[in-house]
Amino acid sequence: MDRLIEIAYKEIGTLESPLNSNKTKYGKWFGFDGVAWCGMFVSWCYAFAGKPLPNIGFKKGFAGCQTAVAYFKKKGWITTKPVSGDIIFFDWNNDGRYDHTGIFVCWNINGTFTSIEGNTSLTNQSNGGQVMKRVRQNKNCIFVHPNIVYV
C-alpha cells in the first residue's frame, strides 16, 4: 500500500474549485462532480495506485459512505487492526450513519491515528473542500481492509 499512501500524500492541499462548489478532479474522473467527494477521493487514490475498488454503486468505486459501509460489511472486510492504506469511515454523531471517509496512514503513539481525507478542513469534518492530513481519535469510526485480489 506504499504507492497508495504516496499518491494520497501528493494530493494534500488540493482544493475544490470554485470554493464551496464540491467540484474537483476526483468528481470529474468519477463522473459525478459537484457533490460531496470524500468517497470519490478514496476511490481515485486506489485506482491511481493500481488497486481499483470494486463497483460499489458506481463503476469506479464508491461515492456514498452508507452504501460503501454496507458493501464492505457484507464482504467481511471490517477490521479492528487497520494497516496503512486501509479505508476509514467516520460516524460523527454516533447514530449508525457514516458521514465521511478517508485513508488510514498510521497509529500515533498517543492512540490517535493519522489519515488522509478529501473534502475536509480544520473547521468542517466532512464538507471542508480540501485534501488534508488529519489526526483523529479512534472513536465512532470503522476500518476496512479491502481484501481484493488483483490478477
Regions found by a protein language model. Give the residues of each.
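Active-site signature of cysteine proteases
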Residues: G111-V151
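Solvent-exposed, flexible loop/coil residues
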Residues: K23, F30, Q66, V135, ...
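N-terminal capping segments
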Residues: M1-N55, I148-Y150
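...with weaker cross-activation on analogous glycine-rich loops/strands in unrelated enzymes
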Residues: I5, K51-Q125
